[in-house]
Amino acid sequence: MRCPFCGNVDTQVKDSRPAEDHVSIRRRRFCPACGGRFTTYERVQLRDLVVIKTNGKREDFDRDKLERSIRISMQKRPVDPERIDQMISGIVRRLESMGETDIPSKKIGEIVMEALARIDTVAYVRFASVYKNFQAADDFEDFVHELRPPAPPES
């Protein structure tokens, strides 16, 4: 692992343990060249995924991009950050275990929306507004109306 301080490629692992999410390994490293100490996280990647964008363009799957978009939709929501991390790891595992290396961005969006709907409806609507490209307040209203269960008949 390259030292982020001096660029030396010969660093030493001083401590290694499971991370809080129990999906990755946290390693404390030391650089003998500059004395710098830093932490790295390592996680299993089952396969290299490629995202097929709606315009047909292909790009490597970026877990960080997925995480950023989910965290933006979750801003200022009363959801435990560890729960968000678990959700993201679950989404990535689901994508990796689909058996396909090429995954349409639409499929990723559907999986994310499914997960968000179970955790926080406000984050779900926020994500949907970007994913479904809402253009006006009516788009929000229609979407939220679909979420509401039908009113019971009055007697």
UniProtKB/Swiss-Prot annotation:
Full protein name: Transcriptional repressor NrdR
An example Pfam family from this entry, by short name, is: ATP-cone
The molecular function GO annotations come to: ATP binding; DNA binding; zinc ion binding
Query: PANTHER family, from UniProt?
Result: TRANSCRIPTIONAL REPRESSOR NRDR
**InterPro entries xrefs:** ATP-cone_dom, NrdR-like_N, RNR_NrdR-like
The GO biological-process annotations, alphabetized, read as: negative regulation of DNA-templated transcription
Locate the transmembrane regions by residue number.
none
Protein family according to the UniProt entry: Belongs to the NrdR family.
